[in-house]
Amino acid sequence: MKFFIDTADIDQIKAAHEMGLVDGVTTNPSLVAKTGRKFTDVLKDIVQLIDGPISAEVVATDAEGMIAEARELIQYHPTNIVIKIPMTGEGLKATRVLAKDGVRVNMTLIFSPLQALLAAKAGAAYVSPFVGRLDDVGHDGMEGVDEILTIFENYGFDTEIIVASVRSPQHVLRAGLQGAHICTIPYNVIMQLTKHPLTDVGIERFLADWKASQQ
């Protein structure tokens, strides 16, 4: 399973990259706003650091505007930039046009398997089901991922699933067990993945034994 990091914070991206845990990056307008920096400056920094898919989201709500923004964004790195487009009727129109031109689209804000199916039919390279937000309203977000995987396998879609809105290591574990292609994970959850209480106990014991043996 590939790990993407879900952030626009360049320091977090660097830290995760140094651990070998960044196969790609996903951003959105909210994450960029948290940095207090211009979107274009953030994007330039990420492109220089990461050699992998980098999702940059459009803010237009009409297909024509989405396509125009997409054509500007891919200039930052024609190979690695992936255009993030929301799951709407206009988004499907834009995705169809961009996909025909060879532009990879990550269709975001997916909340149902049927939305994922429509995105795949439009030519999206990736779909991003938001599992945490579904959990928030009483649904099992990861169950939806399993259903999307089944549909894509049934019909031979090449579209990859990016498990998004990840809130805990449990989401990552279930994604791995289900066979999801990618998890995009916030930095704090990535750090949680590195930890286990027994690991800390083991380190303390090893250090204590070593110290005692050297006296």
Swiss-Prot record:
<keyword id="KW-0704">Schiff base</keyword>
<feature type="active site" description="Schiff-base intermediate with substrate">
    <location>
        <position position="84"/>
    </location>
</feature>
<dbReference type="GO" id="GO:0006098">
    <property type="term" value="P:pentose-phosphate shunt"/>
</dbReference>
<dbReference type="GO" id="GO:0005737">
    <property type="term" value="C:cytoplasm"/>
</dbReference>
<dbReference type="InterPro" id="IPR013785">
    <property type="entry name" value="Aldolase_TIM"/>
</dbReference>
<comment type="similarity">
    <text>Belongs to the transaldolase family. Type 3B subfamily.</text>
</comment>
<dbReference type="InterPro" id="IPR004731">
    <property type="entry name" value="Transaldolase_3B/F6P_aldolase"/>
</dbReference>
<dbReference type="InterPro" id="IPR033919">
    <property type="entry name" value="TSA/FSA_arc/bac"/>
</dbReference>
<dbReference type="Pfam" id="PF00923">
    <property type="entry name" value="TAL_FSA"/>
</dbReference>
<keyword id="KW-0808">Transferase</keyword>
<dbReference type="InterPro" id="IPR001585">
    <property type="entry name" value="TAL/FSA"/>
</dbReference>
<dbReference type="InterPro" id="IPR022999">
    <property type="entry name" value="Transaldolase_3B"/>
</dbReference>
<comment type="function">
    <text>Transaldolase is important for the balance of metabolites in the pentose-phosphate pathway.</text>
</comment>
<comment type="pathway">
    <text>Carbohydrate degradation; pentose phosphate pathway; D-glyceraldehyde 3-phosphate and beta-D-fructose 6-phosphate from D-ribose 5-phosphate and D-xylulose 5-phosphate (non-oxidative stage): step 2/3.</text>
</comment>
<keyword id="KW-0963">Cytoplasm</keyword>
<dbReference type="GO" id="GO:0005975">
    <property type="term" value="P:carbohydrate metabolic process"/>
</dbReference>
<dbReference type="GO" id="GO:0004801">
    <property type="term" value="F:transaldolase activity"/>
</dbReference>
<dbReference type="InterPro" id="IPR018225">
    <property type="entry name" value="Transaldolase_AS"/>
</dbReference>
<dbReference type="GO" id="GO:0016832">
    <property type="term" value="F:aldehyde-lyase activity"/>
</dbReference>
<protein>
    <recommendedName>
        <fullName>Probable transaldolase</fullName>
        <ecNumber>2.2.1.2</ecNumber>
    </recommendedName>
</protein>
<keyword id="KW-0570">Pentose shunt</keyword>
